[in-house]
Structures are given as structure tokens and as C-alpha cells.
Amino acid sequence: MLKDGKAYAYAAWAVAETEGKVPQYVKRQCQSWINIVDDKDPDAVVDERAYQKICKLMQLMVHPDLHCSIYEGLEDYAWLFITATLCTKCRDADERYYITALLEIARKNFKTFNSAVIFIVLMLTEPAFSRFFSVAPDLSLSSELKLAIRKIIKSSPALIDEVDPAFKILRSQIICKLNDNEYTPLAYSQDTMDGKLANAFLADEAGALDDYPVEAMRSSQITLRNKLGIIISTQYPNDNNVMIDEID
């Protein structure tokens, strides 16, 4: 059950923590999610079937650095981030409750890697012909997500079977052959963000972006029922960036 997992345990620890390690707004968000899991929220519930499916997929994915399953190697905070994002549903509809997943965290905490796990799960489970994008200040940074996805796929025999691989990795995109879902990295400095239809998108290092890339991605999702935007960043020494707007 979800209550027995690392996501719920981490949320409970964050709420109870008294040494100043957890910011107050994180505590409030964790308490809000605990209320959902405990069936105390009038608008949202957790989907146990979706949770079980995600756990099985993570058991198939191999961590490229730890050489164990993603299920075993994932950090506790990442379990909460991924589980809350993908398994929290609207009570009156089979749609994700959260349409934005926001993560501000210090460097070297695997935020792009954890986003890659979410993207692989989505590419395997979303409806056929779904499209996914990452946006960042330049193509090199935007392609960090592609690199992380590629490393996980290449390390996971179940995903890269020589006879019938689940994914096709191209220079400019990654395609899930099971359903023709595709992921493409975009660069704010080179690519127009308009005219895309993003079932899900990642804004990486949002502290170095203005609001145009995120708003363009969101505009592309207007007609979609089950949409998701993941916005991640460390802190940047400027007052004009989309991360500050999202936190506010």
C-alpha cells in the first residue's frame, strides 16, 4: 500500500521534523498530501493502482550509477515528488490532481534525473502519440534530461531489449515504440516554443528563464485533459525569473 511506502514516510517525517531542515511551505505541502492519502481531502484521492504500476515500472528501470533498480535506489524525497505528482487524482475524475510539479532544491540533488524517471513512466503509460518536451536556456542544458533518460534506458535490459526495444533513441528525440510517444528537448535560445502540443513538459533551471517558455508550454496544453508541467531549479541571484513567479 502507498501508506507503507517511502513517499508517505518522508512526508510524515517532513511534517514532524523540528530542527529547521524542512521549510514551512514544504511542511504545509506534505501535510496537505498526507490528508489526501488519509482520505481527508474533499477534492483529491490517491490512486493505488497507479502507484502499483509505477512501482513495477521502477523495478524494471536500472539506476545507471548505483546499478540497482530505481525502486531501490531512489531518494526518499524523490519518492514523494514522483508519487504525489503521478498518483494523486481528482476525486470526481480520472485525471491528475496536480498539473504543476515544482521543485526548488540545491545543486547535485538529482532533480533532472528524478524528472527523467517521471518522463520514462509517462512515455510508457500516457495515451498513444503523446508528446513531451523539455525547455531550458540553451540546448545543452535542455538535453540534460535527454541524457538522463538515455542513461536509464541504456542501463535497463527490460527497456532496451536487443530484439524488440521499447525505446528508439535518436539524435534529436527519444521515441517509445510501444505507443509512438515522443520526447524532444527544446532550447529557448534557438527554438520557438509556440505550436507545440505538450502532454507534459519540463522547465529545467527555471531560475535562469523568464516566463515565456513556461507560458508557451502551458498554452499548448489548453485542450488537454491530463496535462503536467514540471518546473525545477536551484536558486538564482536575480528577481526576474519564472521560478520566483511560480513559488509566489
Task: Please provide the spans of the model-predicted regions.
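Phosphate/NTP-binding elements of NTP-utilizing enzymes
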Residues: 1-248
